[in-house]
């Protein structure tokens, strides 16, 4: 399936029109394709449309500290685009787009891995970037309680390096295995002159399914509910424009050791994004999960409020989880304010679940040795996210 058709699945499922492959793209090699020749549903109604951004709204810049804006990310332009799209596609804002199908919803999400790709080019680490690609979409759709069904990818480059492309696809296959979903198809586009030598771009689309009476939507969240955090592997796939700016300013190279650890900066920054699908679906099956947020672009500040109804806020307990060394280094080397860190990075928590107090006790008491769950906060009356 072409990228345009995949994006339509995620963003405009409601059109109830056939999704068609892009047959007019020059110098394009279709790896595999899927053609949907008729609408998936019957009523053409849209429940939710997803439009995710890798950027977040940033407050006033610190006088000396670096910000996402300093790194070249125009937050205001991104917010303005979302506002304009909202006029054409009411209902945007969820982590995944929902399309009714009988007694279930198809849930779709599409994403890329941002400028983490530039570190892949520099380090030569191409075999895990595909895991990042899958993770960004499947982690989004599982926030609705959806089980991923299939994934499609788009690989674009100026000149096809078969060995590199094979490594990338291997990572995508690994990510799909971790998600219990199928790599159903994709597109490989070779477009001379559009990319620099040795560079490529990636994007992907995941589609899952959830019963209508099992959708996780946050509507039942109340003050006093508990926020459980699932640890990240590091930076994951967001904020790399700022990461690269800090790296350049620090005078260190990717081969240097990460301060405060026994691994290199390359190893820390290229650690693949955690895929939370199996873990989250298992927790959902045991009951008490009311809302889920994937902590991506926008960090804690912008993502957590997407989960609960108006009139409620989140109180996050400072020091309630272990912040990885890579974030401590980024903040110190870039002189980044606390508020900027929280709006840009996951700070060591890649997924949060809002659960009832009873479910929280069960989750924390019965976790296995391999499980790391943190009670990181609670739901309170108010708005936004407060740290204390």
Swiss-Prot record:
Any one of the GO CC terms: mitochondrion
Compartment list: Plastid, Chloroplast; Mitochondrion
Location (main, coarse): plastid
UniProt entry tagged with the keyword Ligase: yes
Top-level taxon of origin: Eukaryota
Pathway field: Purine metabolism; IMP biosynthesis via de novo pathway; 5-amino-1-(5-phospho-D-ribosyl)imidazole from N(2)-formyl-N(1)-(5-phospho-D-ribosyl)glycinamide: step 2/2
Catalysed reaction equations from the record: 2-formamido-N(1)-(5-O-phospho-beta-D-ribosyl)acetamidine + ATP = 5-amino-1-(5-phospho-beta-D-ribosyl)imidazole + ADP + phosphate + H(+)
Cell cycle as UniProt keyword: no
EC number: 6.3.3.1
MF GO annotations: ATP binding; phosphoribosylamine-glycine ligase activity; phosphoribosylformylglycinamidine cyclo-ligase activity
UniProt keyword list: ATP-binding, Chloroplast, Ligase, Mitochondrion, Nucleotide-binding, Plastid, Purine biosynthesis, Transit peptide
GO annotation (BP), single: 'de novo' IMP biosynthetic process
A Pfam family: AIRS
Family that this chain belongs to: Belongs to the AIR synthase family.
Protein name stated in the entry: Phosphoribosylformylglycinamidine cyclo-ligase, chloroplastic/mitochondrial
Species annotation: Vigna unguiculata (Cowpea)
